[in-house]
Design a protein with these regions (language model features):
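Contiguous segments within soluble domain cores/interaction surfaces
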Residues: 2-144
Length: 144
């Protein structure tokens, strides 16, 4: 049975020229000024462990705060000689209908291998008030 070694939500993930998994800007919260909110780009970086050369079928699932599934992506993976497979799932223009705690899951069949929470929070925008006033002129004849 496959296992998840790690699962990170981040701004960007990729494999470099020598096979190092580069994971940039991990996060677990998104602040949005209004809902529905669209997040321009994010990436799931993960390492799946199985047997060397094993064909693995895993599914990514994004769940809404009410439990309904918002998105699903199925992936076929072949484990390397060490039994591991590094994966990057890039998500673009993901729409979040409401604030709350979303769930990111990696499944094999119906079994949840790993899950993470992603909180969507309504951002408080600063109130627009009158512009600041310059300081009052000082009396030049007055001693300090």
């Amino acid at each position: 049975m496959a296992q998840v070694d790690y699962l990170h939500l981040c701004d960007l993930s990729f494999m470099d020229q020598v096979g190092k998994h580069c994971i940039i800007g991990m996060f677990d919260i998104i602040h949005a000024p209004a809902f529905p909110a669209t997040h321009p780009t994010m990436s799931l970086a993960m390492r799946i462990l199985g047997q060397p050369g094993e064909a693995l079928q895993v599914t990514f699932e994004l769940g809404r705060p009410n439990g309904n599934v918002l998105a699903t992506v199925a992936m076929d993976v072949v484990a390397g000689a060490d039994g591991g497979a590094n994966l990057n799932l890039n998500l673009s223009q993901t729409q979040f209908p409401e604030p709350g705690r979303y769930t990111l899951k990696i499944l094999s069949g119906k079994e949840v291998l790993a899950s993470r929470s992603l909180r969507l929070v309504k951002m408080d925008l600063p109130q627009q008030g009158p512009p600041p006033q310059p300081p009052a002129p000082q009396d030049k004849n007055k001693l300090h």
